[in-house]
Amino acid sequence: MQRVVISGTGLFTPSESVSNDELVVAFNAYVQNYNAVNAAAIADGSLTALAESSSEFIQKASGIKSRYVMNKSGVIDPARMFPHIAERPDAQIGIQAEIAVISAREALAQAGKTPADVDAIIVACSNMQRAYPAVAIEVQAALGCGGFAYDMNVACSSATFGLRNAADAIRSGSARCVLVISPEITSAHLEFRDRDC
């Protein structure tokens, strides 16, 4: 049986971060506006007023002091409270593929491999920014790899399923070197308008 190892890893970290203090300023402004707009419904009991937050509350509840995000301005805008990630045309590499290529290059360098060594790419994450083209195909083209490439979505277990599929491909002989990439944009998963989320 073919031996399977993880020979390299790569990481993409967004360039922007949001501190608890910054998030609280935006969140509390959102709460004040929500409560003002819904004052009548709150007064008659059909809606519950939202509670403001504090940096201390967030740190005590989660241990988090700061988080890296894609598009800080959207996250800390009280009228939005989520990132604005612009759509790109299909002919342009998608943001997830761009992230994936950065981490893939780092993993290949760490493993002492080149794109020519890769004969399979599995992009495994819980949300894809767009349905077409497949992120894995974009990565394959950007790196110049051969073989096969596909996306898989198994919700929160996507990365583990991707690793398993890669190991199975190597054990079966259908691949020798597989890139498994999980370019999650978690900034877009979070509900920054919910204090308890």
Where are these regions (language model features)?
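Short acidic/histidine-centered micro-motifs embedded in hydrophobic/aromatic stretches
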Residues: 61, 124, 181
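Proline- and acidic/polar-enriched loop/turn elements at helix boundaries
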Residues: 71, 120, 150-152
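Short, histidine-centered active-site or binding-site loop motifs used for metal coordination
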Residues: 10, 122, 184
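Conserved "HGTGT" condensation-loop signature of ketosynthase/thiolase-family condensing enzymes
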Residues: 1-117, 143
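Acyl-thioester C-C bond-transforming condensing/cleaving domain
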Residues: 1, 15, 32, 46-49, ...
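Conserved beta-strand elements of the Class I
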Residues: 5-7, 119-122, 176-179
